[in-house]
């Protein structure tokens, strides 16, 4: 539905990265910018989202959901009410909530800087809305957006996420140096380029081990934080385990700042 770095806009793959293989797959001329629309023409309202989910689920037989960065949230109220009207089996299997401060290789600067809600607001908001509509057990919540260290992963789970995903963390594990050349096809580390000469700089065997080590550390670190909070796993973390420092310099637990959930 939308991405944190560019809510309200579709994707753009610069022409210099549209090689013969991509051109064939997408059905566009080689070397031409590939502009994706900012929405699906089949989806005009929240009810259409459920129709599309049913279509994809029936075609693939796999769990189906959607990803969105949250801004105005009235459409979610309508969506959840429609689910209860149709029946709980019509619900998406998951919703991925992307933070407004998420990253991308190409997006307009005003959208990256100023549009959408950060995860600290949108995640508890959506979790509470699911509780309100009795859908919390049916729909799983996936959190994304700069969740690259164990403390951030533990924080997201405490706020109500069922899962956490991270693109940025894995890019760092691969060796990303933030050269800011993703859109130019000149990534010096070989990660985001289609240039075969530059790609040779990415040693797959070496980077595979680094990525494995990164994931192992994330799991270990999140578990370590959970044990320090007195629970046996990170999935048992709740808002009461997290505190936020206020302007006064004193901290408040999240279950006081946000209405808690079961």
Enumerate the language-model features and the residues they cover.
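Flexible glycine-/small-residue-enriched beta->alpha junction loops
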Residues: 1-31
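Short helix/loop capping segments that flank catalytic or ligand/cofactor-binding pockets
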Residues: 6-10, 105, 235
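N-terminal leader/propeptide and maturation segments of large enzyme subunits in energy/redox metabolism
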Residues: 20-29, 39, 43, 209, ...
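Short capping/connector residues at structural and topological boundaries
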Residues: 23, 27-30, 40, 45, ...
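Short glycine/proline- and acidic residue-enriched helix-loop micro-motifs
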Residues: 31-39, 201-205
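Glycine-rich phosphate/ribose-binding loops and adjacent secondary-structure elements
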Residues: 40-199
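C-terminal extensions of enzymes
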Residues: 175, 200-262
């Amino acid at each position: 539905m939308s991405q944190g770095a560019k809510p309200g806009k579709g994707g753009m793959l610069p022409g210099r990265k549209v090689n013969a293989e991509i051109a064939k797959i997408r059905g566009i001329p080689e070397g031409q910018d590939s502009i994706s629309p900012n929405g699906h023409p089949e989806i005009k309202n929240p009810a259409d989202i459920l129709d599309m989910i049913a279509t994809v689920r029936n075609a693939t037989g796999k769990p189906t959901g959607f990803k969105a960065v949250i801004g105005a949230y009235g459409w979610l109220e309508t969506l959840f009410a429609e689910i209860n009207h149709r029946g709980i089996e019509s619900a998406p299997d998951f919703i991925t909530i992307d933070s407004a401060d998420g990253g991308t290789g190409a997006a307009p600067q005003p959208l990256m800087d100023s549009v959408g809600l950060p995860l600290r607001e949108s995640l508890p908001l959506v979790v509470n809305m699911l509780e309100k509509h009795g859908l919390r057990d049916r729909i799983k919540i996936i959190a994304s957006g700069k969740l690259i260290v164990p403390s951030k992963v533990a924080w997201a789970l405490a706020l109500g996420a069922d899962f956490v995903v991270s693109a940025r963390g894995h890019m760092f594990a691969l060796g990303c140096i933030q050269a800011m050349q993703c859109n130019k096809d000149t990534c010096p580390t070989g990660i985001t380029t289609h240039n075969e000469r530059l790609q040779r700089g990415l040693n797959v065997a070496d980077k595979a081990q680094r990525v494995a080590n990164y994931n192992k550390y994330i799991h270990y670190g999140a578990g370590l934080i959970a044990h320090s909070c007195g629970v046996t796993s990170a999935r048992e973390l709740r808002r009461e385990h997290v505190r936020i420092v206020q302007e006064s310099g004193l901290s408040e637990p999240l279950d006081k700042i946000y209405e808690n959930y079961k």
